[in-house]
Amino acid sequence: MDSQEATKNQGDLFPIRTVASETGVNPVTLRAWERRYGLIKPARTAKGHRLYSQQDVDRIKQTVSLLDRGISFSQISKNLETQPPENTETSARSCDTWTAYRAQAIMAIIRFDENQLNLLYNEALSLYPIDVVTEHMLLPLLVSLGERWASSDGSIAEEHFFGAFMRNKLGARLHHRHWTPTGKKLLVSCMPGEHHEIGTMLFSLAAHDHGFRIVYLGADMPLRELVLSAKRAACDAIVISSSIAPHQHILAHELPGLVKSSRYPVIIGGQTSIRCADAIKRAGAHAIGTRIRESIRRMDEILHD
């Protein structure tokens, strides 16, 4: 009896791309979890392709949930088997993992050491889903660099160095992402006047890993062009990212005009979706916050209402 037959009693088996879309964990990371930590043991076809049971999928989702809480890989197997309450010692070890990543990355940025920064970035993304890396490493790094500049410990050059590094990395990932013929299609852009698009790119990659199709327009996009663009691309929703407060005219007139003229849901993410939640609601748009995983979950609810 081969491994595929041995798992028939578990129900349907799913290929790795299906599991990646269901869980938000890309295939490279799934294979790393299997190889390095033995967290999952998928069946194999005669040609060696991985097949995952529903039990495997549930285990992957549990792993993501634990990682999102900051639990380290050394503790995850125990948590999966026993599900004990998270304790202070476990949390401290987990925080140490991300603290170490961030400290090493800061040193690489201070030294303008692109090779070391690249090694850290690739290692983190080989082990963790991009939304977990974003929350625990990349966004805190951006905050730390801003604080260094504000306190005169750092320089604008450091921020520009890291910003250029991230745009190159994320742009390449967006360009080379695996094409999928199904899934809701999102038109993603930044609010007019918004030139910081790293958060928008991170959101787009995480949404893609969760099975959405992405049409990415980038920074400083006039709202008046979004409806026609969404129609031409046959999108299911318009997603706008905004981290700086938009001009009042945009919230009071342009955004309501966009919602009124659009047959697609208009969704706002980023800091503006928190600070200006009431104005966004009055305009008829949906605010989804700043935490990527929760934003994607909320967006999925909006599109399936």
Where do the protein language model's features map onto the residues?
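Short helix->loop/beta-hairpin flanking segments within DNA-binding domains
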Residues: 1-7
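Polyanion-binding surface elements
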Residues: 9-29
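Short glycine-/small-residue-rich flexible loop motifs, especially phosphate/cofactor-binding loops
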Residues: 17, 31, 63, 204, ...
